[in-house]
Amino acid sequence: MISQDLINRINELYKKQKESGLTDEEQQEQQKLRQEYLKGIRKQVLKQMGEDPEKEPKNN
């Protein structure tokens, strides 16, 4: 699930990146948070399509 805290932190890091740059640790955190966000979006899309996001995808 995508929480507002997750979105807020992603936005904070984005703003800092544009203003003054990020440390290596912040860059790693940013990547991790973005991946978590994308995973949540994919789950939401699959759920709306009627597929179980926890199941393995079908190979067509």
Curated annotation (Swiss-Prot):
Enumerate the subcellular locations listed in this protein's record, separating them with semicolons.
Cytoplasm
Entry-linked SUPFAM superfamilies: YnzC-like
Report the protein name in the record. UPF0291 protein Nther_1806
Question: Which branch of life, at top level?
Answer: Bacteria
Family from the record: Belongs to the UPF0291 family.
Q: Which residues cross the membrane?
A: none
The family database entries (Pfam families) matched by this protein are listed as:
DUF896
Assigned GO CC terms: cytoplasm
Q: Which UniProt keywords apply?
A: Cytoplasm
